Regions:
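ATP-binding N-terminal substructure of ATP-dependent carboxylate-amine bond-forming enzymes
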Residues: 1-105, 372
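PAS/PAS-like sensory domains
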Residues: 17, 187, 254-257
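Active-site nucleotide/adenylate-binding loops and adjacent lid/helix of ATP-dependent enzymes
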Residues: 110-195, 206-209, 238-242
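Peripheral (often C-terminal) accessory segments that flank ATP-dependent C-N-forming ligase machineries
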Residues: 142-145, 299-376
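Glycine-rich phosphate/pyrophosphate-binding beta-alpha loops
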Residues: 163, 220-223, 276-290
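Phosphate-binding site of ATP-dependent enzymes
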Residues: 170-249, 262-271
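Conserved metal-phosphate-binding beta-hairpin within the catalytic cores
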Residues: 249-284
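C-terminal, active-site-flanking charged/polar segments
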Residues: 290-296
């Protein structure tokens, strides 16, 4: 049996809830390492639960102890949230433990893990197309910044996710006001904003080799274009696949990655914006795309690490995350969207989590709580 340990530090991070199901479909024995109220436990698809707290020192020490006491039991350890990746990346010095626990094989590229400035530096190192950026410091006055960057720009706090910690600044005259709103300026990234087509990508790598992937046109955001998404149209792309193969080998990606590109049609350039070396909420829904991550996991179990060489499929499918999208519809009065859910638009009912009562129940509680907030 192929044994995996799924690890989450952030109990309220709901994107972990369906990940055990994805591994179970691949035939794995699934252990989870998380707090008592974690979404990672809110399913029936894990075999054992190892309890920890969300206190960083306790979490780190318990995880390292668990791994060291079971050195050969787990074939794969998967960190599922940015906070866990950041904590363990900062804590581990041993190259053996680094490769055992963290999702890249090249320890020299560890800066990319849960770090906005780290990603920008890695892009510069390997000549990967990314928007022009600078690492902000108090020594950079407004005139210097305006000379180095073309506005509009984004202000990105170094450790941030789901759109939190990102600001849009349209003009240099507004920059100081934007800077005043930043809560943590350490390694703050100022980056040119590229107007183009946003492309969400999920990918699975093994030892730098691309195993499987999906890319998507973004159809709906929860709040603004820097927040998480609720509707996507999935497809395959030879251009994206080629970029992913290069990225995986250069960085040494070894696991899942949630990636964002923006395509500038006039320049014919795909700019890399985000690489979060972890799973996301969309990956379990790959079973509806024809490019299933559970099948990718099976390939890894079978030792099939060969690159994807077949031409991209022309098949497209629209997918929506039930609770997130319905919450968006209610929050912003999107009655058309609500009606689409009621009428099973494009087979949307497939995406309701009826296969698992535990996660369906917790999802329902969260939706009801949000609805009551909206009413009262």
């Amino acid at each position: 049996m192929y044994n995996v340990l799924l690890v989450s530090l952030l109990g309220e991070f709901d994107a972990t809830g369906e990940i055990p199901f994805m591994f179970k479909r691949a035939g794995c024995t699934v252990d989870v390492f998380c707090s008592a109220d974690s979404w990672l436990r809110s399913n029936k698809y894990h075999d054992r639960w190892f309890e920890t707290s969300e206190i960083h020192s306790d979490f780190k020490n318990k995880l390292l102890k668990h791994v060291e006491e079971n050195p050969d039991y787990y074939q794969w350890i998967v960190l599922l949230d940015d906070a866990a990746i950041k904590l363990m990346n900062e804590s581990i010095q041993s190259e053996y433990l680094f490769k055992k626990i963290l999702p890249i094989t090249k320890i020299e590229n560890r800066a990319i893990l849960s770090s906005k400035i780290g990603l920008s530096v890695i892009c510069e190192k390997y000549s990967i197309a990314t928007p022009q950026f600078i690492n902000y410091s108090e020594e950079n006055n407004l005139q210097t910044i305006s000379q180095k960057l073309h506005f509009p720009i984004l202000l990105k706090e170094n450790f941030s996710f789901s759109g939190i910690g990102i600001q849009y600044c349209a003009d240099s005259f507004l920059l100081q006001d934007c800077l005043n709103k930043v809560t943590n300026k350490t390694n703050l990234v100022l980056q040119e904003f590229i107007e183009g087509e946003d492309i969400g990508v999920e990918a699975l790598f093994r030892d730098g080799e691309l195993i499987t992937y999906n890319c998507a046109e973004i159809l709906a955001y929860m709040h603004n274009k820097f927040s998480f998404t609720t509707r996507r149209r999935y497809y395959q792309s030879d251009e994206i696949a080629s970029l992913l193969k290069i990225l995986g080998k250069q960085v040494g990606l070894n696991g899942f990655a949630s990636i964002q590109y923006v395509y500038h049609k006039g320049r014919n350039i795909y700019y890399l914006l985000e690489v979060d070396a972890r799973t996301n909420m969309w990956m379990p829904y790959s079973r509806f795309t024809g490019h299933d991550f559970s099948e990718g996991i099976k390939k890894i179990i079978g030792g099939d690490f060969y690159n994807i060489n077949e031409p991209a499929s022309l098949h497209e499918v629209e997918i929506s995350i039930f609770d997130r999208d319905l919450r968006r519809c209610i929050k912003y009065g999107d009655f058309k969207g609500i009606l689409q859910w009621m009428l099973n638009y494009k087979g949307y009912w497939r995406f309701i989590r009826l296969y698992d009562f535990k996660i369906f129940y917790r999802t329902g509680k969260k939706m009801l709580k949000d609805l009551l907030k909206k009413i009262f």
